[in-house]
Amino acid sequence: MKYLLLVPILAIFILAGCAKENSIMGPQSSTNQSTSQWIKIIHSSSLSVENTYTASKSIDGSKGGTVELTKVFKDDGNWALVTAKLTIPKGAFSGTKFISYIVNTETASIDFSPADTSFSKNLNLDITFTGVNISGYKASDLIFSYLKDNSIVPAKFTYANANIAQGLLVVLGAQISHFSRFGWSTLDGPISD
C-alpha cells in the first residue's frame, strides 16, 4: 500500500518540478522591449493636407551654417505652424555636405539626411509646433527623443515644453551628434542624463 501511494506522489513532484515557472537554474530573464512610440497629431479624416516639409542646404563644415524652415499648415481644421532651425557649428565636419531634413507634421518628428552621418561637434536643433491637436496625450508622458538602433531614446536638450491645451511642442538646444529621426514620443522609463 505504501508503494501505491508513493508512485502518484512522486509523479506529482516530478511534474511540478518540470513546470515553466520553476527552474533550479534561477529565474528566467525576460526581454524588456521599449514601449515608447512616436506621437500622432490628431487630424480630421476629411482633410487631405501635405504633412511633410523639407529644408536643405549645402554647408561648408569649416564655416558652419544653418538650415531653417517655417511652414503654416492646417491641423484639424485650424491653422498651425512649424518652425525648425538646425545650427551646424564651425568644424562639425570636414568638407562640404548637402544637409537636408524632412519635418513630419503628423508625428511631430524630423528626419535628417544623409542618414547615419556623425559629427565631431554636436549640431543644435530648435523645433516648434504651434496649434497642433495633441489632446490624446498627457504632457508628463511626452519626451523629445531620437531613434538609436531601432529604439526610441530620450534626447539631450536645453529646454522642452509640451502644452496640450495650447497645442504647443517646443524643443530648444537639442544636441545632435548623428543624423537619425528626432521627435516627440511617449515616455518609457527614466530620462537619461
Ranges and model annotations:
Residues 91-132:
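Mature extracytoplasmic domains of secretory-pathway proteins
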Residues 19-82, 116-120, 133-193:
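Proteolytic cleavage junctions
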Residues 1-5, 19-20:
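Positively charged n-region of N-terminal signal peptides that target proteins for export
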Residues 85, 124-126, 173:
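Beta-strand secondary-structure signal
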